[in-house]
Amino acid sequence: MRPSQTELWLGLTLTLALLAVRWASAQAPIYVSSWAVRVTKGYQEAERLARKFGFVNLGQIFPDDQYFHLRHRGVAQQSLTPHWGHRLRLKKDPKVRWFEQQTLRRRVKRSLVVPTDPWFSKQWYMNKEIQQDLNILKAWNQGLTGRGVVISILDDGIEKDHPDLWANYDPLASYDFNDYDPDPQPRYTPNDENRHGTRCAGEVSATANNGFCGAGVAFNARIGGVRMLDGAITDIVEAQSLSLQPQHIHIYSASWGPEDDGRTVDGPGLLTQEAFRRGVTKGRQGLGTLFIWASGNGGLHYDNCNCDGYTNSIHTLSVGSTTRQGRVPWYSEACASTFTTTFSSGVVTDPQIVTTDLHHQCTDKHTGTSASAPLAAGMIALALEANPLLTWRDLQHLVVRASRPAQLQAEDWRINGVGRQVSHHYGYGLLDAGLLVDLARVWLPTKPQKKCAIRVVHTPTPILPRMLVPKNVTACSDGSRRRLIRSLEHVQVQLSLSYSRRGDLEIFLTSPMGTRSTLVAIRPLDISGQGYNNWIFMSTHYWDEDPQGLWTLGLENKGYYFNTGTLYYYTLLLYGTAEDMTARPQAPQVTSRARACVQRDTEGLCQESHSPLSILAGLCLISSQQWWWLYSHPQQPVTEGQASCHPPVTPAAAA
């Protein structure tokens, strides 16, 4: 019997209602039974609070006595509405400085699924099989293999007993924040969905010359893994992962982020932002932790990594991808926050990255920007071995200088105000490990970071179809009129605006030296009418430029003719240093202290000198105090010595 018209209408109405609920639940925050709470008097106060309101105190979020992780067993594990009762109770307690009920955060691994390709027995991206590779062999031939450096892979766990990983595995650099135990071993499933972290780990630190798989870029570095993507992901989980053992771990590598769907605008929560800040200010005994991030795989959806608050943070070093042929991969996101590029693959016939895989296996199928970030992390480990005193900002300066346009193909290569080529696809180009370690050895410490905030718009202003907002910057100086910033590093634009179709709005910024950087290009799939709420865009394209002069923000409607919007707030944020960085040599230089070197190699690098710690301008130095003394007394003579700094080694000898 055919259903009546009324039954059809009822069925259709019910279906639409269910779809609406599903859509709403996908868009709305999902609250969980965990709270982050900041109290005034540490652990005892957190315990009192937990007992008073029926929480379980799961301990500190950061290694101090302020932020705590509380869970309530009487609250639903997942809900579309916050628990207002506990919210009111915590709000009324005078000892609670801040609290937040946690929500699930959608994070995706930045790998790609491709059909089976033939096995590639050679690692073409670092063994000179192609003319312009990552120049890893040059660093290895100088005896640099990552020894003494610790890297942690923040992902879905690593197979710690893998034949190519166990010798370098570091339990202190590992933890499981999904199950809260010390074992980061991945959860095995029929389709091996949790292979991502193990693959990233092998790129960095797979053991060399053991007759298995290939060699990691830094094959003597210690490697750890944090299991944090295989379960409920909250701000607490992310913050704790990024704060694990900050005095032990030198580099955190992350190949994940918000969805690369061309619609999402999302970034770290308050706790994760605090974890980044603490990492760069307190990590590595104050030198600053290195956070290496994959730029994203949303190219097919015209996504832009400046809509990802992890890759566009000033505290992370964002890495893009190129193919063996030097082309832009189909998944690559073009954005102004990318620093540098390493290899991955493009179409399915392209050679991919060789690395470790689950079940004690090897693979030649690792790809996406997920594969690019760990290669960069390994190269930075080589630089840290060459010079352990480098700060997080030193490394960013070095990466800018050690990246080469090489053979990379793109239509948007431009020369910025200080003569460097830069691209939204590749940043400053393909990272060169040999050049990176050469520069690291002779790098003088970067002077302190300065910040200049200029509020440009603070009253509602209608957005025209094409709108330019000029601002002449002359006030980046202190009370004595000394210039705070002479050379730029990061430039941020903080915006609050409404727009009828967000993805149709292109935003760009032009510097006083004429460099135009696209902060966000059109995103056709982003039909949101929410605009940008206090969102921060970032560009690396003005590195070392002089900030003084006319800055111009541009907003242009690239889509529907009748789009309308309002600009509520615009602040220009300039970061940099008082030093004129353009006066520094752009390549390694041998100074007048060259006589302190006892023996040099064929390339003129010092091999025999005063101490096994590091070389500065062709000279080995014993301590950070000696480093700073030489920096302050450049004309003083130095006594010669005879100890070896970095004797050359082959991978076979160093394995």
UniProtKB/Swiss-Prot annotation:
Gene: Pcsk4
GO MF annotation: an example: serine-type endopeptidase activity
Glycosylated residue positions: 472
Entry EC number(s): 3.4.21.-
Peptidase S8 domain location: 123-437
Source species: Mus musculus
Function (record text): Proprotein convertase involved in the processing of hormone and other protein precursors at sites comprised of pairs of basic amino acid residues. In males, important for ADAM2 processing as well as other acrosomal proteins with roles in fertilization and critical for normal fertilization events such as sperm capacitation, acrosome reaction and binding of sperm to zona pellucida. Also plays a role in female fertility, involved in the regulation of trophoblast migration and placental development, may be through the proteolytical processing and activation of proteins such as IGF2.
Protein name as annotated: Proprotein convertase subtilisin/kexin type 4
Subunit field text: The proPCSK4 form interacts with HSPA5; the interaction takes place at the endoplasmic reticulum.
UniProt keyword terms in alphabetical order: Cleavage on pair of basic residues, Cytoplasmic vesicle, Glycoprotein, Hydrolase, Membrane, Protease, Serine protease, Signal, Zymogen
Phenotype of gene-disrupted mutants: Knockout males show impaired fertility. Sperm from mutants exhibit accelerated capacitation, precocious acrosome reaction, reduced binding to egg zona pellucida, and impaired fertilizing ability. They have abnormal acrosome formation during spermatogenesis. Sperm proteins are hyper-tyrosine phosphorylated during capacitation. In females, the percent of successful mating is comparable to that of their PCSK4 +/- female littermates, however the average litter size of the former is half that of the latter.
Catalytic machinery residues: 155 (charge relay system), 196 (charge relay system), 370 (charge relay system)
Record localization: Cytoplasmic vesicle, Secretory vesicle, Acrosome membrane
Any single Pfam family the record assigns to this protein: P_proprotein
Listed InterPro entries: Galactose-bd-like_sf, Kexin/furin, P_dom, Peptidase_S8/S53_dom, Peptidase_S8/S53_dom_sf, Peptidase_S8_Asp-AS, Peptidase_S8_His-AS, Peptidase_S8_Ser-AS
Top-level lineage group: Eukaryota
Tissue distribution: Expressed abundantly in the testis since postnatal Day 16. In testis, strongly detected in round and elongated spermatids as well as spermatocytes. Also observed in residual bodies engulfed by Sertoli cells at spermatogenic stages VIII and IX. In ovaries, expressed in macrophage-like cells of the ovarian theca, interstitium and corpora lutea.
UniProt similarity note: Belongs to the peptidase S8 family. Furin subfamily.
Propeptide: 27-110
A cellular component term, taken from the record's GO annotations: acrosomal vesicle
Post-translational modification: N-glycosylated.
